[in-house]
Curated annotation (Swiss-Prot):
Organism: Drosophila pseudoobscura pseudoobscura
GO CC terms in record: nuclear body; nucleoplasm
Bias (Polar residues) ranges: 649-664
Skewed-composition ranges (Gly residues): 51-60
Assigned keywords, A-Z: Nucleus, Phosphoprotein, RNA-mediated gene silencing
Name of this chain's protein: Serrate RNA effector molecule homolog
Biased composition range(s): Basic residues: 363-378
UniProt-annotated location(s): Nucleus
Molecular function terms from GO: nucleic acid binding
Length: 951
């Protein structure tokens, strides 16, 4: 008990051991006398004045310790830094992941991104700036982890100057500060790439292999959508609908038709769009508990289904045969009898509805008893066979006679059964003739089928019986019986087919007609929280075990959500989606709570846009913009060309002019049907001469406004372009946005914005402002994505493949001794480095290729002008001086009343002022905060009025 008491007392005070461990040795142990106890946390029991001195409390009681021993005699010593008077700051923990998320070295000692060198360099620079008199602010600490929300704060020019020599020149300072900013940006790109390069979403964007596969997959989706659009355009479906909010039902029908076609549906499946009320009622009844008897009464079944239901119990639960010792012959014979029984059951269960089934079962029981008695005699005769050979010969003759009797009895029973079946068949045929218009029940259909097969079965059974009499051994008899059963089944199959052919007009036609499938209606689950390390394949493997699973969509991560992602899992409409959602909520994937909830159906699929879009001038402008967007997107994905999908490259002058709309024509060089003859609708027309002659001016129209002028021909051209963008490229023109990864979402064509109700009048200023602002909103689709040039990515730290391969070889060439070199990749030793180099290129070629791919991977990330990265730290962003409320060290300057005077040289350092040409103060020359005090103004009331007043 002494040990346990001591252990309990020690653990009782260990709650904050980790937090105090870092400063215990500095603060407490240095001030304690040498002769004092040095155990620190291990001596809490000795420091407790209410406990005994021994471990178990049995020693002499100790005196109450003098706490001055921990500080030493006299006044407390003041150390140089005030940071020792306070505990260290609280250690923050990340929400997910362990450590900084950076993987270990993949290539041995080869560090391609120089992460350790970056960290050491910038930690030393930041620590050089922060002197020992002040701790570094939390916002300026170097942050290494890859899951932070912002980049670490970059030193401004004043802070950077504090780290340099006082005698440095201005030009040298600016040169070094420019280098510091460039290196700082390179470090942030390096850290972000290393933190996310193993994640699936990052590989799909920039990996040399995964990005190509993803692009080809997206191109396949677009080609499929293009084929569907062309089909609908040719059959007139696209031309018969208007992108107007008043035609919402027609728009929804077109979108649903596209979805059914994309899912592989046929024209028969499109009929479900006309049966929406009926389909909704059926769906509402599915989750409810329905009485199975009512369903059986209302829905007729085919003979095939009835036969399958009868045979199910024979296959579902087979008997497990126990292994017995060889000597127990009786039990083994019985097991063999059970083993032989199942193949005969299909023959015996066919006349299941006939009356004499109890008599058949009684005869079978008698046969089984005879077999058991006979085989018991066989086992006893086998045991006594060693005594006399005559007894064994007599037992074998008895066995053959009993087997013959058994076979005769068996076939006599079958003959009686066939006669009964014929009688039942005649009765059934008579009943069927009476009820000509009535529906034939499945039970009445089965018996004529089996009666038609009876003559063949009887003939084959007699022939097999003769062969069984001639066979001398029991094993041969068993084989022939098994063969007979197979022959009976094979002979019964064509007979049943003929019998089914007779009742085809009644039942089979109903069974073969497939109802239209509502392939545009789905059920889905929304995953609110997916860690970046979770892959799409893992979610698919988790959800594919549920029936009705279709696809999975995962969104790109968001920096404000710590790179966590959202996901959508799509199922068919007829599944119990709440049960699946409950099952997913009870599971964790990579220790991540996915947060699964049921995704609701879309509330409003057609949403109105500004009604001014129906005006003729706006429509003509929209046709221009739509045509430019269509050309850019078609060229990006090579939809109407046979060439392979090419990556975006730096735009040339000719491409830039075409992108800006200054090209010679639209549609002349394109095979896209929606761009054919598009230039005929882009030429504006106006009666300028007539207005000039009649003296009509536009000022009067501007004051009163002009009514909305509609041009149906222009609107039909615009509608084709808008629907092409929406169906093929998932671009909602009137919402100036793109719906990403729509082919993997639950609704593949869900929402569309259409022209809303038009106003009565509109002024020309409103038209011009609307056209100009709308073009700015669509700028992301009008401009081509141009990658950075080689010179630009070199400034960002681009890598050379040959240089990195050479570094990889050097890192894996280690000298052990003279003429003794080691290759860490294989552990082999060589006489010189040239042999290791040859060995690496011959035996570890996949490692070298991986280094080259890694270089290309990193350079692809740098080339993207829209690359994902952490936002800049708020302290690094330039702000007006009025917003700056902290000094350079992160401390708030002293506050003053509005009417009080500022202290001397207040603007020199604390507000960024100062004298001289550089405006840089000397390093750390300000007084401590406690020395700053407010100057009290004094005014002598007896002084004359014209004297100077100091306030």
């Amino acid at each position: 008990m002494a040990d346990s008491d001591d252990e309990y007392d020690r653990k009782r005070r260990d709650k904050f051991r980790g937090e105090r461990e870092s400063y215990r040795t500095e603060r407490r142990d240095e001030r304690r006398p040498i002769g004092g106890a040095g155990g620190g946390r291990d001596e809490w029991s000795e420091r407790n004045p209410f406990r005994g001195g021994g471990a178990g409390g049995g020693g002499a009681p100790r005196h109450r310790p003098d706490y001055s021993d921990y500080r030493g005699p006299g006044p407390r010593a003041r150390y140089g830094s005030p940071v020792r008077d306070m505990p260290p700051p609280k250690r923050m923990r990340s929400d997910w992941g362990d450590g900084d998320g950076r993987p270990g070295p993949r290539y041995g000692g080869y560090d391609p991104y120089l992460m350790q060198a970056w960290t050491d360099h910038y930690q030393s620079m930041h620590s050089a700036y922060h002197h020992a008199s002040h701790p570094p602010p939390v916002r300026e600490l170097p942050i290494i982890g890859g899951d932070t929300l912002t980049q670490p704060a970059m030193l401004n020019l004043k802070q950077f100057l504090d780290t340099q020599d006082e005698n440095i020149s201005d030009s040298e300072v600016m040169r070094k500060y420019t280098e510091y900013k460039t290196d700082f940006k390179r470090q942030q790109l390096n850290e972000f790439f290393v933190a996310h390069k193993d994640e699936e979403w990052f590989k799909n964007k920039y990996h040399p292999e995964d990005s190509v596969n993803r692009s080809e997959e997206q191109r396949g989706f677009l080609r499929r959508r293009t084929d569907v659009f062309v089909e609908l355009l040719e059959n007139g479906t696209i031309g018969s609908v208007k992108v107007d909010s008043s035609h919402g039902d027609a728009l929804i029908r077109v979108l649903d038709t596209c979805v059914i076609k994309l899912e592989g549906g046929t024209d028969e499946d499109l009929k479900v769009l006309d049966e929406k009320p009926k389909e909704a009622l059926v769906f509402d009844r599915k989750p409810e508990s329905v009485d199975p008897t009512t369903v059986v009464e209302n829905t007729p079944k085919s003979p095939k289904k009835e036969k399958e239901e009868d045979e199910l119990p024979l296959i579902v639960s087979p008997q497990r045969i126990a292994l017995k010792p060889v000597n127990s012959d009786d039990e083994n014979w019985d097991d063999a009898e059970v083993e032989d029984a199942p193949p005969k059951k299909p023959e015996e269960e066919e006349p299941k509805e006939s009356e004499p089934i109890p008599e058949i079962k009684q005869k079978q029981k008698k046969e089984k008893k005879k077999k058991i008695k006979k085989r018991k005699r066989n086992s006893s005769s086998d045991e006594e066979s060693s005594s006399s050979e005559s007894e064994s010969s007599s037992s074998s003759s008895e066995e053959e006679e009993e087997d013959d009797e058994k076979l005769k009895a068996k076939y006599d029973v079958e003959d009686g059964l066939r006669a009964e079946q014929k009688a039942e068949a005649e009765k059934d045929q008579a009943e069927a003739a009476k009820a000509k218009l009535g529906s034939v029940s499945p039970k009445e259909e089965i018996s004529p089928e089996k009666s038609a097969a009876d003559p063949e079965v009887e003939g084959e059974a007699k022939e097999d019986g003769k062969q069984a009499e001639k066979s001398p051994k029991c094993d041969d008899e068993k084989k022939q019986e098994n063969g007979d059963a197979a022959k009976v089944e094979s002979a019964a199959e064509p007979a049943t087919g003929d019998a089914q052919g007779e009742v085809k007009p009644v039942t089979i036609d109903l069974d073969k007609v497939n109802p239209p499938r509502a392939m545009h209606r789905t059920s889905s689950i929304f995953l609110r929280n997916l860690a970046p390390s979770i892959t799409k394949a893992e979610i698919e493997a988790l959800c594919s075990r549920f029936s009705g699973y279709l696809r999975t969509a995962i969104a790109d991560p968001l920096v404000e959500r710590r790179w966590y992602r959202r996901g959508w899992i799509t199922f068919t409409r007829d599944v119990n989606i709440k049960e699946i959602c409950w099952s997913l909520n009870n599971q964790r994937l990579r220790d991540c709570e996915m947060g699964a909830i049921v995704n609701r159906d879309l509330s409003r699929r057609v949403r109105p846009a500004n009604g001014i879009t129906a005006h003729k001038q706006v429509v003509r402008s929209d046709i221009k913009l739509c045509a430019r967007i269509v050309m850019n997107l078609d060229e990006k994905f090579k939809l109407w060309s046979e060439g392979p999908l090419s990556k975006p490259s730096p735009a040339s002058d000719s491409e830039a002019t075409a992108a800006n709309g200054s090209g010679s024509s639209y549609g002349f060089n394109s095979k896209n049907p929606v761009l054919q003859n598009i230039t005929d609708y882009l030429i504006e027309e106006a009666s300028a001469e007539e207005e000039e002659l009649l003296g009509l001016s536009g000022d009067r129209k501007d004051g009163e406004g002009e009514p909305i002028e509609r041009d149906e021909q222009l609107l039909s051209v615009l509608d084709r372009l808008v629907l092409y963008l929406r169906i093929v490229h998932s671009v909602d023109y009137y919402n100036h946005c793109e719906y990403p990864y729509e082919d993997e979402m639950p609704n593949r064509c869900g929402i569309i914005h259409a022209r809303g109700p038009a106003p009565s009048r509109v002024t020309s200023n409103e038209l011009n402002e609307y056209i100009k602002s709308y073009e700015g909103k669509l700028l992301q689709f009008l401009t081509k994505t141009a990658l950075l040039s080689e010179d630009q990515i070199k400034d960002l730290g681009a890598k050379n493949a040959d240089t990195e391969v050479e570094k990889f070889v050097q890192a894996n060439t280690q000298e052990l001794a003279k003429d003794k070199w080691l290759c860490p990749l294989s552990g082999k030793k060589f006489k010189g480095p040239e042999f290791i180099r040859k060995h690496i290129f011959n035996k570890h070629e996949e490692k070298v290729d991986e280094v080259r791919k890694e270089v290309q991977y990193f350079n692809n990330y740098l080339r993207d002008p829209k690359r994902p990265q952490l936002p800049e730290h708020p302290g690094s962003v330039k702000r007006p001086e009025t917003e700056s409320v902290r000094g350079p060290g992160g401390y708030r300057p002293p506050m003053y009343t509005p009417m009080s005077g500022m202290p001397y040289s207040f603007g020199g350092h604390m507000m960024g002022g100062g004298r001289g040409g550089r405006h840089f103060p000397p390093a750390r020359r300000e007084l401590p905060l406690e020395h700053h005090r407010r100057l009290v103004g004094y005014h002598d009331l007896d002084a004359p009025s014209n004297s100077d007043i100091f306030d």
